[in-house]
């Protein structure tokens, strides 16, 4: 009997438990860890939003490991609530991190975690894993840590009255080399790998010289971006926290989160929504110049329940259904096909054309929330077929579906959640 695409993806996800699982006790951090590395050959440390996505995927295979993944992420949390975008579990045993990691960590934290954030996906992962595992008791013990994390974000990365988070490095967006950030990085014209790499390391050095202190970095403004994806997931995370608190009878906390989520969403609609092109645009610099390239980062705000239905419908029609922009054979490309920077093979630089499963999953969720069931189903089917055909790869050619980048890539197993839930 021929194996179905969902069945093939399930088998691939199951193999991650053999190839990507890392367990042990870290004496530097003082905690036990059990997580899936994003890719055993390329990315061996725990990464923030990778773990959030991987937990959702693996919950369909091993719910207990999915819970351990998220508990491990929280085990490295600082006392003030901060969680770094990379945690170097077992570094003394596995060897030192890549040299670039030193430039993204404070002195004294080099064998524990980085000093950068990633898009807030933790609350959503906790909620989804609890749903898949049918375990309402999973979230309550984590709420204090989740509250502390969200408090840190609001107090340290939202300096203005609009409530929007500011990122201080393109790595904090999770889409490191997206052309969305070329202007903020001082890139004019074509961005080469070595040129952008030098700019990245130079920015790391400047942030390191500011001790990765949020006040100093925001004051210096070397990289000051209110990113559309980071803030969409922030607002979505706040709304998720409201639901989690409400389920536990914490109505006052729930109301506070609802208010903040609404405020951030309203600010995005006012400042970021480009109605002429039906896309959200990141804000560059203190002047809040709108980013110009059409990228998937401007579509992720579809995840927000608070955006008007007509706005969501316009984005779906003019962007996701457009063959000139994002409706390719294996959607959704990270950059619109109409953009000069579009590279479907990801040659040299990533996030400049290939399709990524994590953003597909976010868009699929957003389309479902806004009544675009047919388009959501088409996206799920294409994503599952792509992964079944090419395997768990880091990203994919949107024309051919060819798998590219790292192999045994954990978050691409999100296709399983799309298959199981569609």
Regions found by a protein language model. Give the residues of each.
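TPR repeat positional signature
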Residues: 51, 119, 123-126, 231, ...
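Heptad-repeat amphipathic alpha-helical coiled-coil interaction surface used
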Residues: 123, 130, 235, 239-242, ...
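Hydrophobic/aromatic-rich effector regions of fungal transcription factors
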Residues: 105-117, 121-132, 362-366
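Extended glycan-interaction surfaces of carbohydrate-active proteins
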Residues: 2-45, 70-112, 162-226, 263-355, ...
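Alpha-helical support elements that line or immediately flank enzyme active sites
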Residues: 51-81, 297-308, 360-373
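Extended, well-ordered alpha-helical scaffold segments
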Residues: 4-16, 62-75, 135-154, 237, ...
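Internal, well-ordered domain-core segments that constitute the primary functional module
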Residues: 118-175
